[in-house]
A protein has these predicted regions:
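Glycine-rich flexible loops
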Residues: 1-275
Length: 275
């Protein structure tokens, strides 16, 4: 396990990355990491994640209470982090952000649950859409609860996204993969009808993921990205995912001007990331 000082340095770095990638604006988003003693280091409330310093971070107990009086107040959305840590002992880092493409799907009530990319099935799995919960209230973590044990990243209805993992780099990578998948899914829908991977290909990818140890026990059915017909295992939250993402198969209709503007903006964001 990393020391508190090392985690402070890494949280500041992750905050800088999500800001520079355009995953957050102003003081949006929050990042946390769990220490070996069970305490949690989290970003403070109302601070730009791209301009944080190590001394701005807040050390809290499992309930979110400050352990040092002279530190700032923790993120107002810490309850979401608390819920994830309580339900997933294997998780030691959480990243919450508002990536534009992923959040666009969340606002449109469309989960990222189609088996379109082999890399996504291997490294991330299905990204369901949770129900809406008012930010900074207990509604938000409660809306996530049915999905947390079975998934490593979630779209938050009309809000944003959250990703988590055994350490900060993995949590950030999952957020980055979520946004990348959202971009490709949108482009595929605009170009034509996305071609989903066949069942046998999905089964092989899930086998590889299980052998590599990238999948928690009992989550195989949930990681199949929307594929359920004839699957060897089913997802315990499948019905909830479908009810919250009822618009997943709707047709997207745009004017030529709107399509041109969207593709131009997508190209600009991709070029920005390459730089």
């Amino acid at each position: 396990m990393q020391t508190e000082r090392e985690l402070r340095q890494q949280i500041v770095e992750i905050g800088r990355r999500i800001y520079e990638h355009g995953f957050v604006a102003a003081s949006d988003g929050n990042v946390s990491a769990r220490l070996a003693d069970g305490t949690i280091l989290t970003t403070p409330t109302m601070v730009c994640k791209g301009r944080m310093s190590e001394d701005m971070l807040v050390l809290v107990d499992v309930n979110g209470s400050k352990l040092r009086r002279d530190e700032r107040n923790p993120s107002s959305e810490f309850a979401m982090h608390k819920m994830i840590y309580q339900m997933r002992p294997d998780v030691h880092a959480v990243v919450h952000a508002h990536p534009p493409f992923g959040t666009g799907f969340a606002v449109a009530n469309v989960p990222l649950d189609k088996p379109l990319l082999s890399e996504v099935i291997l490294t991330l799995g299905c990204v369901p859409l949770t129900g809406y919960g008012t930010p900074s209230t207990d509604e938000l973590p409660q809306s996530l609860a049915p999905f947390i044990p079975h998934h490593d990243a979630l779209l938050l209805a009309n809000h944003g996204a959250v990703a988590y993992g055994p350490e900060l780099e993995t949590a950030f990578a999952r957020m980055e993969t979520l946004e990348h998948f959202a971009k490709i899914t949108l482009i595929a829908r605009l170009v034509g009808k996305p071609h989903e991977l066949p069942p046998d290909a999905i089964e092989k990818l899930l086998d590889v993921r299980e052998r590599a140890g990238y999948m928690s026990a009992g989550t195989r059915g949930c990681q199949a990205c929307g594929y359920s017909q004839g699957h060897s295992s089913t997802c315990a939250v499948g019905s909830a995912t479908r009810s919250y993402g009822a618009n997943g198969d709707d047709t997207v209709t745009l004017t030529r001007r709107e399509l041109t503007a969207l593709i131009t903006e997508a190209a600009r964001l991709v070029a920005r990331e390459i730089k």
